[in-house]
């Protein structure tokens, strides 16, 4: 696989199949900014992860999950300075492990985890096209909501 090149700061979302990131399968990562909308299956990411350590600023939802899964798989991430989950928590917004709760309260239409994968413990992995679309929607929400969350934190 060729190296991934992304221009500008970006949001990323790491999708897993299940609710326990310590043991469940990582599916892939979505990248989003005004120039890029990209989904990378996790097995492909492991072959070309260098962009995760670039100087570009990155933001995510649940950095602890992202960091743990990457480390567990011998990967690293640098310059991830904003966690939407922590920001929303500090602002007393409705947060859960499922980013859809927060996004839908902010007028995004993101499917809840169980709508895409089925009940926890009985999940079914859908086609990669569905995973990619749903994961990119989540990274888009992270990217587009960052400024508003930062402004609310500063006020």
Mark where each language-model region is.
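Conserved RNase H-like, two-metal-ion catalytic cores of nucleic-acid enzymes
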Residues: 1-105
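Mixed-charge, glycine-rich, non-catalytic linkers/tails in nucleic-acid processing enzymes
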Residues: 78, 115-155
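Hydrophobic/aromatic-lined pockets within catalytic cores
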Residues: 91, 95, 107, 147-150, ...
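A basic/glycine-biased coupling hinge at the interface between accessory DNA-binding modules
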Residues: 106, 110-117
